[in-house]
């Protein structure tokens, strides 16, 4: 059985949010005082794995784990390891991750060891003052260290930037030059 959308296109890519929680409060994403889903309403890692198995059986070849911030999910590496093992016995080819980067320094090596070869990092500015303003209490230095640690572990990084008028639209060239210097 294959998944086909209303335009008769084959669906082979699944994005799955593993948590609604995040360690940042980016202005355009979360309120400072968020109300999160009760834990009993969040899928367990086993349920997420079963869901992924069903989609893999229907032709999904790529799974992207997202959140909130997926790296704050307890035992996320165990899920990634289980999904990675499916690459050898199913049609699954790739597991990727979208993250704010705040925990990458801690997890980069484990992510690589468990089959993550590409990560999207949400980063709207490299100006520390603006970063603190947009994230409320984020630390740009941790994110940069995490990006560098990921690169050191041969993980490809893609930077996702939300361009906002009167905030960061004049920083795009600097951000591009910065990423080029990282050899992303």
Regions found by a protein language model. Give the residues of each.
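Hydrophobic adenine-recognition pocket in adenosine-nucleotide-binding enzymes
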Residues: 18, 70, 163
